[in-house]
Amino acid sequence: MNYYRINEDSMYFVDFPGYGYAKVSKTQRAVWGKMVEKYLSERDTLKLVLLIVDLRHSPTSNDKMMFDWLKHYDLPMCVVATKADKIPKTRWQKHIKTMKQELGVLPGDNFIPFSSEIGLGKDELWGLIDGYIRPSENESPDSEDAEMIANESQQEESTEA
């Protein structure tokens, strides 16, 4: 697993590189699979899973398994269909429809066609991520956040005096 710190608010992206593509033994792949399952099912701080798929091709059996597993455990997820720039724009809708059908994406499920080359989907994806990581108005901050807010308030009061 690779951890990428995104900002000072302790937001991290965790990457499971090539869970379906690594050239390793079936035994090693099974060990990785259990590690990924354990990580995803036991992370209280998990906000959103981005399932990265290649829009040029049908989803792999691993893509389908992961999608089904995430749905089964009701984990917040977004399918990010990358490499849209590698497909003629006139064929995007066909590829999107095929990908959604083969994965079993339902209306209301998060699905974003994406291209880092042309910026397609970038703003939509960051907006979605932002919506998952920021507490809603109805949500109270957890105890760690509450403590941090209290400390900041005390510091502001002491600097004003």
Question: PLM features: residue spans?
Answer:
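Switch I (effector-binding) loop of TRAFAC-class P-loop GTPase G-domains
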Residues: 1-8
